[in-house]
Amino acid sequence: LYPNKMRTIKILLAAGFLLVFGTSIHAQVQRNETYLPKFAIKTNALYWATSTPNLGIEVGLAKKLTLDISGNYNPWKFGDDRQIKHWLVQPELRYWLCERFNGSFFGLHGHYGEMNVSNLNIFGMGHDRYDGNLYGAGISYGYQWIISKRWSMEATIGVGYARLEYDKYARGDGGEKLGHNTHNYFGPTKIGLSFIYVIK
């Protein structure tokens, strides 16, 4: 009889666990369906690490669809003729696999910006000074973790294309103009580790 009683107890415990777990999941789903965030602001910590102030907003369009728009601006000049002066706007349409502002998403983004960079060899162009603009598009994947009702964290990475059109100058103030060039870039176009505050 003892083994039969133990088996019955195990079955009852398992059934109770499944009942509680299922009820909890159902309540969570109901809560998420009645309250999905609609609007959030964010900032990318990785851009701040390059001394680039930045801010983004994200707006809910449907249960699994959002529009993210980020912008950054860097006016600084450093020593040894180094500078990464630029502004950039990057809108992105996101499709969420679970629900918006939660879990995995795929994105389609565009970008446009103007730059005045020197002695950095970005995009593999060399160490001269480059004054011009860029535009293009890409795809991305990201994941968002909910920390609390108002706070979240997000990691994202994207690849794509950028067309650069620029005037090339010798390094230094008043450097000689060396020509006008274009450059087609394929590679990473988006990377982020962002902190998010949900407004509503």
Regions found by a protein language model. Name each.
Residues 37-39, 49-53, 83-89, 102, ...:
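Residues that define the transmembrane beta-barrel architecture of outer-membrane proteins
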Residues 45-49, 71-77, 95, 110-116, ...:
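Transmembrane beta-strands of outer-membrane beta-barrel pores
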Residues 64-67, 101, 149-153:
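Repeated loop/turn-to-beta-strand initiation elements of outer-membrane beta-barrel proteins
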Residues 41-43, 57, 69-71, 91, ...:
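Membrane-embedded beta-strand positions of outer-membrane beta-barrel proteins
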Residues 95-96, 185-200:
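Outer-membrane beta-barrel "beta-signal"
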Residues 29-32, 53-68, 88-97:
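Feature captures outer-membrane beta-barrel proteins of Gram-negative bacteria and organelles
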Residues 1-34, 199-200:
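Cleavable N-terminal export/targeting peptides
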Residues 72-86, 114-135, 164-184:
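Flexible, solvent-exposed loop segments that connect beta-strands
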